[in-house]
Curated annotation (Swiss-Prot):
PANTHER family: PROTEASE FAMILY C15 PYROGLUTAMYL-PEPTIDASE I-RELATED, PYROGLUTAMYL-PEPTIDASE I. Gene3D superfamilies: Peptidase C15, pyroglutamyl peptidase I-like. It is an enzyme of class 3 (hydrolase). It comes from the Bacteria. Its main location: cytoplasm. InterPro entries: Peptidase_C15, Peptidase_C15-like, Peptidase_C15-like_sf, PGP-I_bact-type, PGPEP1_Cys_AS, PGPEP1_Glu_AS. It catalyses: Release of an N-terminal pyroglutamyl group from a polypeptide, the second amino acid generally not being Pro. Belongs to the peptidase C15 family. One of its GO terms (biological process) is proteolysis. The keyword Cytoplasm applies. This is Pyrrolidone-carboxylate peptidase. Homotetramer. The active site is at E78, C141, H165.
Length: 203
């Protein structure tokens, strides 16, 4: 079994992206699944293209994407991706689409196909705060989640896919008073727990 895990490069003036720091620290084999890791650019469309290329290359059983949600205090497992880009800030090459469909011929939205409630419950058993989120936003995180699910759906692929948002790392909030953060160790444990659930359910 293969699980493709994606993370983003830094964006929005940050020097690091916790999703990539987590990705680098994941084990290479979890619950008997080979973990294939890829960093993707925080760029509309290009991020999706990079992941689709990797899907074609490695033919994974599941794809789990991780992204930063600065301001959230817990691990948030996304329920749904919507067919819209509405960027509050530019992406990493200056694109800032407003009220733009991701795929004019695509479905209005797609639900995650990973077991979101079980993932949340298992993460909480590790004494790490977690919840289901009903919005992945309208920036590149939602864009990537939608793009992957859209590709899987249109091509009739038997690949589970979903997205998990994680908080800032403590080092990112040194000058952001009252902004929540989470330790790298807890975030790695949370994502590895999510992967264990996905691996069990994908067999």
């Amino acid at each position: 079994m293969k699980i493709l895990v994606t993370a983003f490069d830094p964006f929005g003036g940050e020097n690091i992206n916790p999703s990539y720091e987590v990705l680098k620290n994941l084990k290479d084999n979890i619950e008997g699944a080979e973990i294939i890791k890829i960093q993707v650019p925080t760029v509309f469309y290009l991020s999706v293209e990079k992941v689709i290329e990797k899907i074609k290359e490695v033919k994974p059983d599941a794809v789990l994407s991780i992204g930063q949600a600065g301001g959230r205090y817990d691990i948030t497992v996304e329920r749904i991706a919507i067919n819209i880009d509405d960027a509050r800030i530019p992406d990493n090459i200056g694109q800032q689409p407003i009220d733009t469909p991701i795929d004019p011929e695509g479905a209005p939205a797609y639900f995650a196909t990973i077991p979101i409630k079980e993932i949340v419950e298992e993460i909480k058993k590790e004494n790490i705060p977690a919840s289901i989120s009903n919005t992945a936003g309208t920036f590149v995180c939602n864009h990537l989640m939608y793009g992957i699910l859209n590709y899987v759906h249109k091509n009739g692929l038997n690949i589970k896919a979903g997205f998990i948002h994680i908080p800032y790392l403590p080092v990112q909030v040194l000058n952001k008073p009252y902004t929540p953060s989470m330790s790298l160790g807890d975030m790695v444990k949370a994502i590895e727990t999510a992967i264990k659930v996905i691996a069990k359910k994908s067999r």
